[in-house]
Amino acid sequence: TSSCAIINGILNNKNLFYHNAVVTCDDRKKTLCQEPITIWFTGLSCSGKSTIANELDKLLNKNGYHTMILDGDNIRLGLNIDLKFSNDDRIENIRRIAEVAKLMNDAGLINIVSFISPLEINRIMAKQIIGDKFFLVYVNTSLEECEKRDKKGLYKKARNGEIKDFTGINSPFDIPKNADVIVDNIDYKECANKIYNAIEKRIKL
């Protein structure tokens, strides 16, 4: 793909050299008194990813942790405003946010990433970039329920052919094979607590 060609071209550029920071990730996490992690939410549009992510953010903040939420729509309105929904652009969308998440982990932060990220191969790519700090949460809300919640009418537009490549309708969603936590969003506070309990020992320094 063209995205891969660009990335490979950059990686093979012999005029670029990686500079190591004087203040290390270990130094930064000691300052913040926490182990950095990227909690990566995946699920259909309207599954409840952002709602649960925000509740988890509140819970972590209440317990003294330093966090940052990276939301799919917000990123597409800023950093990734040049990307659309072709296969190449979807790959680049995930690649960029994974690189941002890695940088934030290097800064000692706990990331909460809320992206549809529908394809298994793209989630694998994100995990390869982020490394062992990657923690996958699958919000397992049915397509029927997501359509009921859709106040923007996006699913209806997709079914009417007004939106192309819409995940769950005319574009696939691969159910994660190895999610660290699966939640169903029946109660978003319970979901946030379940995730918090799963990561609590991991983020304590």
Q: What are the residue ranges of the model-derived segments?
A:
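C-terminal effector/interaction modules appended to NTPase cores
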Residues: 1-33
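Hydrophobic anchor at the beta1->P-loop junction of P-loop NTPases
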Residues: 39-41
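The conserved Walker
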Residues: 45
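Conserved lysine of the Walker
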Residues: 49
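Conserved substrate/cofactor phosphate-moiety recognition/catalytic segment
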Residues: 54-102, 106
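Conserved beta-strand scaffold positions in the cores of enzyme catalytic domains, especially
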Residues: 69, 134-138, 180-182
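ATP-dependent NMP and nucleoside kinases share a basic, alpha-helical "lid"
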Residues: 78-89, 101-158, 165
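Small-molecule kinase domains that catalyze NTP-dependent phosphoryl transfer to phosphate-bearing small molecules
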Residues: 140-143, 148-205
